[in-house]
Amino acid sequence: MSEDTNLVMFTIGGNDVNFSDIVKECFTLGLRDAKTCKEKVADANTKLESVKSNTLTILQKIDNKLKNDAQVILVGYPRLATNRNYILDNSGVRYDAGAGVRSLSDASMEIQSTLVQEWNKSHPSLKVTYIDGVINTFDGHEPDPSPKHRNPQRWINELLETEGKIKDNGQIESESSSDTNEFYHPNITGHAEIAKLIAEKVGVPTFNNQEPSTKSDIDIAFVIDSTGSMKDNVGALRARVNEIMKKQKKVPPRIALHSLTTRTTLSSTLKTT
C-alpha cells in the first residue's frame, strides 16, 4: 500500500472466526452435525472481541501509512441464512442452527459498529465509514439453509454455485461450481447491492492526487495469507487470477496481475510494504 493511496475498502473477520468451518458443519449435506455446528458458532462468538482488536490494529497501521484525507470504508457482512426454521438434530443433540448463525452475524455487526465509533472518536486524522446496512438490505436474500431448497432471490452463493445474477423474472440464475471459495460469498447481484449501499452512504470517492504524467502500465498484486483458512484454497485463487489476466490482456491499457503467497499476517504486510 503506497502512501498516496486514496481509498481503502475491505471486509474483515470472517476467516478469523473460521467462517468456512461454520458453512461446512452447519449447512453442508453429508458433513453438517448439530454438536459440531453448535461448537463452531459458540467458538466464533468468543472470537469476536479478538476480531475487534485485530481490526483496530490494522486500522492503526493504515493510519500510520496514509495521508489524512484518505478514505477508509469497512463493509459489514450479511447473515448467512434466511429466517427459515432450520434445526439440526442428530447424535442426541438438537440445535437451532439457523437462529445461531443469524445471531452470530448480528453480533458481528454490533462489534464492528462499536469499533468504528470508538476509532473515529479517538483518531481525528483518519475517519472510517462503516457500511452497516448490509444485514437489513440482504434480509430475505440470504441462502436457504435447507439442502432441499434454494432461495430464488438469494444474493449470496449457496453451495456448488457461482456467478449468480438476477434475471428478468426476478429470480437468480447461477453457474455450477466446485470452487469452495465461491460458496457463501455475495454473488454478482449481491456485490451490486453492496456497491449501491456504499454509493448511498459515501458517494463517489474523491481523489486528490494529481493525474500521473505518464500513462504507464498498471501492476496489481494479490497478497495471499496462506497461514489461515486460505491455506487449502491458494491454488483455486491463483487459477481465478490467471483467468482474469487472460481476459484483461485483450483490453488496453495493459494491467498485469500477480498472485503472491505469503506466510505473514495482513498486519505485518501493511507494516513492511
Please place each PLM-identified region on the residue numbering.
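Short beta-strand-loop
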Residues: 22, 80, 85-87, 256-273
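Second-shell loop/turn segments in exported
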Residues: 41-49, 98-101, 179-186, 221-233
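Oxyanion-hole/transition-state-stabilizing segment in secreted/luminal serine hydrolases
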Residues: 1-46, 79-90, 178
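Short, amphipathic alpha-helical "lid/cap" segments that border enzyme active or binding sites
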Residues: 48, 52, 56, 188-199
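Hydrophobic, aromatic-enriched interface-forming segments
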Residues: 51-91
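Mobile gating loops/cap/lid regions near enzyme active sites that modulate substrate access
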Residues: 82-107, 114-188
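Von Willebrand factor
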Residues: 214-269
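Structural recognition of the beta-strand scaffold that forms the well-ordered cores
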Residues: 6-11, 16-18, 71-76, 128-132, ...
